[in-house]
Amino acid sequence: MNRIYRVIWNCTLQVFQACSELTLRVGKTSMVNLRKSSGLTTKFRRLTLGVLLALSGSASGASLEVDNGQITNIDTDVAYDAYLVGWYGTGVLNILADGSASLTTITTSVIGANEDSEGTVNVLGGTWRLYDSGNNARPLNVGQSGTGTLNIKQKGHVDGGYLRLGSSTGDVGTVNVEGEDSVLTTELFEIGSYGTGSLNITDKGYVTSSIVAILGYQANSNGKVVVEKGGEWLIKNNDSSIEFQIGNQGTGEATILEGGLITAENTIIGGNATGIGTLNVQDQDSVITVRRLYNGYFGNGTVNISNNGLINNKEYSLVGVQDGSHGVVNVTDKGHWNFLGTGEAFRYIYIGDAGDGELNVSSEGKVDSGIITAGMKETGTGNITVKDKNSVITNLGTNLGYDGHGEMNISNEGLVVSNGGSSLGYGETGVGKVNITTGGMWEVNKNVYTTIGVAGVGNLNISDGGKFVSQNITFLGDKASGIGTLNLMDATSSFDPVGINVGNFGSGIVNVSNGATLNSTGYGFIGGNASGKGIVNISTDSLWNLKTSSTNAQLLQVGVLGTGELNITTGGIVKARDTQIALNDKSKGDVRVDGQNSLLETFNMYVGTSGTGTLTLTNSGTLNVEGGEVYLGVFEPAVGTLNIGAAHGEAAADAGYITNATKVEFGSGEGVFVFNHTNNSDAGYQVDMLITGDDKDGKVFHDAGHTVFNAGNTYSGKTLVNDGLLTIASHTADGVTGMG
């Protein structure tokens, strides 16, 4: 093939060059020094044109190719169209302290170009600028189809444009930036484009990326970054939309340790469906600061914060973003995930936005954030685990199951502090669950509500010394579709809100058992509004306490505007200042005190305030009336019924007792006092309190047992003895018979 050669004078090198096609092929000598010196100039001046043509081979003087065992040193200013190091064989290019290499045109430079090739560029105090004469960034492929390595040390400086490590399938590219004032600047940085790429920044080395940084770009690629020992990577510019991607379609891993630093804008881990990304932040003073963190966008993402490592989030974070994605954050061994700034608008965390998300905090790990929501969208599933002493989440609110499924487990003295409203089962499709066990605690502060079952389903389970404390009201079953359940399971477990509303507009259930304690010293409402249905079961030596030394509220209301039911059984105890059953004319309330040592203790007792209320004392269950007064059917059109033993028309049961009462009074509604018990002894069931009231609708039913009235009763209405024996032990001179 005919070739055209031309001899030109290179002003930079001060030599004649014979140019042909695209590249200058440096001969197969072991060492070439490209430097500005009189000897080099004289040597080339003595060469004949034929020798110059022979040196040119099949390449052009526009590119520098270092290959076939060649080692080339640059310690002066040079400029080429491209740098090709390790084209088919092995090549080493050293850019030394006084060396400055730059580009003249738009060609891509390559280290480790073809299969089985191996190229190395060492920038040892020199400068390599990969921009053309028009200041346009040009590509550098490190490990194109072979193996490529770029080492930047001894205050070396590389101005990179588009840098790709492992740019083809099966190839390997590595960049090492080591030492203070050793610098790599890039615009687009792909670490593992199609093959395998590694970036190591150590000993205060410094790297910047101003457009995008990607680890594991294409499917089956692998990108790995280690930033350590004061190394730093800055991934940002004036545009906050710049992205740091870890595991785009391939596998990516970034590790920050021993004081390494990364600063980035939007960070995406596990970007696409095939993407697998991992971010590790470990050791004291190891920090990554990001604007927004997307962990598991379409793919799989994992964040590990450990050993005092720190992540600073300027705005929000989504973990398990899209349907089918999976994201995990592990904060352990004094690691810290911190959200900067104030307010809740940009500091929130979604664990399981539309995908599957996990947040695990253990071994003194710490999270400080805005509102945390687990199970945000309908397809989202979020799980939060906080365990071990001094492991803490502090946030502006906790939502479990917004429209999806959310669960939180607090154990082994782990702590969650919510300084804002919190909910379980927010939307109609939302399902939220919280388990507090083995000394775990959830505190809700700042005078805000906690709602279990807003419009969805919420469950709060407390056992083995778990604790819940709130500075305000807790609602169960807030909206009509809401279903809320609270289970307190043992003697060391407690639930301490200011007040509790069980079945506000929806359905609420509270079960307190095995010696557990529920404190709601403001008030307790069961069946709060017209559509509300609430049930509270206090059993097996457990306590519901509504009393304090304060004179404020402390009311127990069963059937406020809706339907309420309170069951005190097997030694359960309820203490309140005043107890009211069925407050509204359309409300309904039922209270049952059943069993030895079962106790309802209240100052005054109102059964059927304006609605239909029933109190049943059976099987030695006791009503202790500290204020001495019991009212039945207080206002029209109320119906208030007090059953001793069993209800009228039912099979007789063992009687319960009233202590410290001075009177039972029928109000202006309908009062009903039923004696249907099994005490048939000669002494009978003793009734010492006065039965009084001017309500002509008042009734005393005697269905079974032997009952003895000891007071001079003055009630109006009827006394109906259907069965059993009623003894009147009080007869006065003015004609009061004790039968009303």
Each model region followed by its residue ranges:
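N-terminal segments that cap or nucleate solenoid repeat domains
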Residues: 60-104, 150, 254, 359, ...
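Small-residue (G/S/T/A) turn/hinge positions that recur once per unit in extracellular repeat modules
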Residues: 69-70, 76, 91, 99, ...
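Extracellular glycan-interaction patches encoded by glycine-rich segments
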Residues: 83-86, 107-114, 137-143, 164-168, ...
